[in-house]
Amino acid sequence: MAKRLWSVFTDDMDHCYLTGSSVVERHHIFESRQGFKKKSEARGFVIPLRPDLHPNGARFVRSMENLQIDRKLKQMAQTYYEENYGSRDDFRQEFGKSYL
C-alpha cells in the first residue's frame, strides 16, 4: 500500500495547489540528505504540484518564477511551523536554516 501523504496547506492532494491541474506530483517542501523529507512528511509540509512546477521532478522548468515559487512554499511552511509547532530557532534546528 502506498504511503498516504497529507498537507497542512490543502486537503486536496489530487490537484495542483497553484493551478488546479489534476496531473500532480507530491512535493516535499524540505528535502535533503539530512532527513528533511521525512520531517516534511511528519509536519505536513507536502504539497501537490504540477510536474513542471515540482522542483525535484524530472519535468521541472528551471526559471526565476519557479524558483520563487519554491522559496515561497518554504516561507509558508516556516510561517506555519512558527505559528503551530515552535520558534524560529526550533525551525532552524529541525530544517537547517531560516527562510524568513
Language-model-detected regions and their locations in the chain:
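Intrinsically disordered, low-complexity segments enriched in Ser/Pro/Gly/Ala and basic residues
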Residues: 6, 20-21
